[in-house]
């Protein structure tokens, strides 16, 4: 099971606080040695100010005395920061200022000019607000951090060196509070900033897009139609697809699940996804991607069925949609099998799908009606499923060939880009410690 776990591979792309839920998720699943995992969990917590959580990892009576001392120091520091930030919050919570921040017509610069001129707000006071928000976040007080960061990002200009960190911090706070509607809004704002604020180097742009896609997993797998948005962002936006291929091919697991389980994107996206999976097979392969490879490239149905069974329930992000994936995978196996054989007995299909014959026939009828599978008919007398021949128009052939040529051109451009960035991409994977909210 450990060979399919992506926690270690993905951790460098997350903030420490976002890694903690992943560790808590895998602890009871016996994927790794329990004692070793507890020590890792403790080391992660020690890099935060969540001292009470650290203490809980020790057996009763074995808590180091220095932790109690550190707890006292943290409480003292929080009070000192609070004294400095209280006047700032009082200004920002005044009715005129709140009305200005709620207005979509005023820029951050205009609001800052007003507050500076009329309330004496200084740059030092704003820095105090940011430090207090970050401190509350490190203590695990995500509600307080979210509130302060919301004030901060609504008043400082985007050129401020802490602005991007505030966007990340606000998103992380909402994720950890499981406020998915707010998190979705924050994710959109962060993506807009990354997409429309070119960074100094292409390497930095790749870093930012890689972080964004990893953090987005928390939101998209907990938000209605989030899987469709994964397909739109990860597969249909070339800069993000390039980033996956250059820096984080393991995200193909989540893209594959999103495509397979999507009710609206699956049909149009499967071909493009399979091409990418085939190209990246030497960089990343997992039960999910291998299932599609077996089904659409090798045409190995027995192996494909085994791969479906191997899809793990031990993935933090995929547990909620695992049954959807299995059901959709069963449909893909059925459709592909019938398209190749054109005529097949329901009894054989039932065996393939691990179902009783009557149950399988009912299931197939429902599938044909629900998904409108082209040309599929059931001959109940003969106990067969018959797939009618589908003719492809000249227009469809031209469109498909054009798409194929476009895809190949994009892949050639990507390979050239890879040659330039391969020597530098290790920086991304080793970029574990940082001074802002992305500090893992």
UniProtKB/Swiss-Prot annotation:
CDD domains: eIF3E. PROSITE patterns: PCI (PS50250). One of its GO terms (molecular function) is translation initiation factor activity. Coiled coil: none annotated. Belongs to the eIF-3 subunit E family. Component of the eukaryotic translation initiation factor 3 (eIF-3) complex. This is Eukaryotic translation initiation factor 3 subunit E. It comes from Brugia malayi (Filarial nematode worm).
